[in-house]
């Protein structure tokens, strides 16, 4: 016996060494993946991807006016380009949200980011496939020094290019337009899994009380992206469009010149690189992170009525146990479920109303913001670069702050359903009041010879207005472009040619009839409007306040939405949200706003005998129509918020016997009856009904999990 002890001890030692080595290997293996097993690391990665997505989306908006001039497009045309992103997103959002919830969500998000990177690179391709921009001759005839002057004396008569050659390039321009649309569709397809799967993945792996803060941070980064996009647009439009092909030291124009075209394509290349590198990180995360605490206490399933035959399941259809019964369902059977699930969700008035309200709010952002840079250029006579820089440094950061504050208020004040919807109603009213003030903040078009006032500013009926007059009828002035000049008489002329200037130094302008010939000169640009600078500063301040307050409703709306559906339907509910946001909130508004803006045009340029881009707008009509559309959408959103509040209030009366459906003053923003404790009432008799109320706010057919929908 004594002799066996050393042997046994030695064997035990070897066994202990083996176990120690295995434990050490497991420890090293665990250490290798630990950085991707933290939900905060995923939040950072998702924020980086959403930041890049927001950047490329806003960058397109920042260069829309540049694209108009580069490819001679109308506002309705660029509206189609802006809406193409949503069309691509719309095509796959439901399928990705439904099937992606059961798949490897981080990898799907990474694949979507790579597709977006490809779309961004394709967006820059038209510049390398079309002819170089020639500002000396341009698409019109300029004088020897690059100015459009009167050719009555024969000077500059042979300076312009062959018109037939220019018109033959029209077909190539149309192809570039279609390529831009296709690239935006590809961007939309790639963005499909990023938001719904990212939000549901985060909501699954954080404590419920922290969910609003995490989602608020996520959407803050999504909105901070446009700030980066506008700043990037401001930088790129200061670089000449063909800077990589020519020696820019020989240029005699600056970004302040109306003929300047910036390097609109450069930002797309940079955004493509950012999208690619931020997407690569997503492939390191697991399908499901380790639970941070007892799932029975933190999961939303704990709030559902308990059934003995049901096993606890994580939300969004992500199964920690791979042998669940529904994993054997065929793809065709799962496709048949989608209409039933969609009908079930839309049959809930609270769910439907809050989604439609979000659509109206997003419609204001999509339509108003898409042409806000153009609006600043027209109303306040800013350059494209200055408008983009101001938007990127003022309004958008304020919107980011508003989204973050909205999520923080939901967390810190423990807002109930009624508190959250009342908060949304309040911020909607305040932001609508800001939009109303925009009706009175702007500048007039001012006198424009032959367009708003007759030449010589004589009392001629408006019907007799004509850009061509006896003073310039022999000048062979072209209308391919708009290069306004301000005359010494305080009147704006469409170009130096229309002012009758026969010299490239902008002197001897025959159409300045009220000015002595020796003083008949013009300077480049529109004539300034009195009081315009003060109106612009006020507009900028109000815009910042409006952006911050209006954005505070976004996070409460999303939180209400994901709390009104059963956990298994969360990802799909978010997919329905983003589908309707694209269908109603993102696609129609740019088209509607663009068509409305075109209707206020006073003078159209012509290109090869066809109507080109608008050269001059009626600023007053532009302002009233542009702002009124936004006010109408905000008002409709308020009605939908009110309907949601009425539905919630009715259910509070129905299910909470002692509350009477009203809220005290202290409960206006911070009701102690929160969604967190509403389903955990200690009274067993009411627990089922109150829990049912959380997910079935309008007493429709109750759905506890996916199997009951089948």
UniProtKB/Swiss-Prot annotation:
Record: glycosylation sites: 153, 381, 457, 502, 505, 519
Keywords: Acetylation, Cell membrane, Disulfide bond, Glycoprotein, Ion transport, Membrane, Transmembrane, Transmembrane helix, Transport
Reactions accelerated catalytically: L-thyroxine(out) = L-thyroxine(in); prostaglandin E1(out) = prostaglandin E1(in); prostaglandin E2(out) = prostaglandin E2(in); prostaglandin F2alpha(out) = prostaglandin F2alpha(in)
Ranges per topology, Cytoplasmic: 1-40, 101-106, 204-222, 287-344, 411-414, 563-571, 649-705
Segments traversing the membrane: 41-60, 80-100, 107-131, 175-203, 223-243, 262-286, 345-366, 387-410, 415-438, 540-562, 572-597, 631-648
Gene Ontology MF terms in the entry: organic anion transmembrane transporter activity; prostaglandin transmembrane transporter activity; sodium-independent organic anion transmembrane transporter activity
Residue positions where N-acetylmethionine is found in the record: 1
Entry's Gene Ontology cellular component terms: apical plasma membrane; basal plasma membrane; basolateral plasma membrane
Region spans: Disordered: 1-25
Name of the protein: Solute carrier organic anion transporter family member 3A1
Encoding gene per record: SLCO3A1
């Amino acid at each position: 016996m004594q002799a066996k002890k050393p042997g046994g001890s030695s064997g035990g030692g070897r066994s202990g060494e083996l176990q120690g080595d295995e434990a050490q290997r497991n420890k090293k293996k665990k250490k290798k993946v630990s950085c991707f097993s933290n939900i905060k690391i995923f939040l950072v990665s998702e924020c980086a991807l959403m930041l890049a997505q927001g950047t490329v989306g806003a960058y397109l908006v920042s260069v829309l006016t540049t694209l108009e001039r580069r490819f001679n497009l109308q506002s309705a045309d660029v509206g189609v380009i802006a809406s193409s992103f949503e069309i691509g997103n719309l095509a796959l959002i439901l399928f990705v949200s439904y099937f992606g919830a059961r798949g490897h969500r981080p990898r799907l998000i990474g694949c979507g980011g790579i597709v977006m990177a490809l779309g961004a690179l394709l967006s820059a391709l038209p510049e390398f496939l079309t002819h170089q921009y020639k500002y000396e001759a341009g698409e019109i005839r300029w004088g020897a020094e690059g100015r459009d002057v009167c050719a009555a004396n024969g000077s500059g008569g042979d300076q312009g290019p062959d018109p037939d050659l220019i018109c033959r390039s029209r077909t190539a321009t149309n192809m570039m337009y279609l390529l831009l649309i296709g690239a935006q569709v590809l961007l939309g397809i790639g963005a499909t899994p990023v938001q719904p799967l990212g939000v549901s993945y985060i909501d699954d792996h954080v404590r419920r009380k922290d969910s609003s803060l995490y989602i608020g941070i996520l959407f803050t980064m999504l909105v901070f992206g446009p700030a980066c996009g506008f700043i990037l647009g401001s930088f790129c439009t200061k670089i000449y469009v063909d800077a990589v092909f020519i020696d820019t030291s020989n240029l005699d124009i600056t970004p302040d010149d109306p003929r300047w075209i910036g390097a609109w394509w450069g930002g797309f290349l940079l955004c493509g690189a950012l999208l690619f590198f931020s997407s690569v990180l997503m492939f390191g995360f697991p399908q499901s992170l380790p639970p941070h605490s007892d799932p029975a206490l933190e999961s939303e399933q704990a709030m559902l009525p308990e059934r003995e035959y049901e096993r606890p399941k994580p939300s969004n259809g992500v199964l920690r146990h791979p042998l669940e019964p529904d994993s054997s369902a065929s793809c065709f059977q799962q496709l048949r479920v989608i209409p039933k699930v969609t009908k079930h969700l839309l049959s809930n008035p609270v769910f439907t109303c809050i989604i439609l309200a979000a659509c109206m709010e997003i419609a204001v952002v999509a339509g108003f913001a898409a042409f806000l840079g153009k609006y600043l250029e027209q109303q306040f006579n800013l350059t494209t670069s200055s408008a983009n820089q101001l938007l990127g440094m003022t309004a958008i950061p304020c919107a980011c702050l508003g989204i973050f504050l909205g999520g923080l208020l939901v967390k810190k004040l423990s807002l109930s359903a009624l508190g959250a919807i009342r908060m949304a109603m309040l911020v909607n009213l305040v932001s609508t009041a800001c939009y109303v003030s925009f009706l009175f903040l702007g500048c007039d078009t001012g006198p424009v010879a032959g367009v708003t006032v007759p030449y010589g500013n004589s009392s001629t009926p408006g019907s007799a207005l004509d850009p061509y007059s006896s003073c310039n009828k022999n000048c062979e002035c072209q209308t391919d472009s708009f290069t306004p000049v301000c005359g010494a008489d305080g009147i704006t002329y469409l170009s130096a040619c229309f002012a009758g200037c026969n010299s490239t130094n902008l002197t001897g302008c025959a159409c300045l009839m009220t000015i002595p010939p020796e003083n008949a000169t013009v300077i480049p640009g529109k004539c300034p409007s009195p009081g315009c600078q003060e109106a612009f500063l006020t507009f900028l301040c109000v815009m910042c306040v409006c952006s911050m307050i209006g954005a505070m409703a976004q996070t409460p709306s999303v939180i209400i939405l994901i709390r009104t559906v059963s956990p298994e339907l969360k990802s799909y509910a978010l997919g329905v949200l983003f589908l309707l946001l694209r269908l109603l909130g993102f696609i129609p508004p740019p088209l509607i706003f663009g068509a409305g803006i075109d209707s206020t045009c006073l003078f159209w340029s012509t290109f090869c005998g066809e109507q080109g881009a608008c050269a001059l707008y009626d600023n007053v009509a532009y302002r009233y129509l542009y702002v009124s559309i936004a006010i109408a959408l905000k008002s409709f959103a308020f009605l939908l918020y009110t309907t949601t509040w009425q539905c919630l209030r009715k259910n509070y009366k129905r299910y909470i016997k002692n509350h009477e459906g009203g809220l005290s003053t202290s409960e206006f923003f911070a009701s102690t009856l929160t969604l967190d404790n509403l389903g955990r009432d200690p009274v067993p008799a009411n627990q089922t009904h109150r829990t049912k109320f959380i997910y079935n706010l309008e007493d429709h057919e109750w759905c506890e999990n996916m199997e009951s929908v089948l």
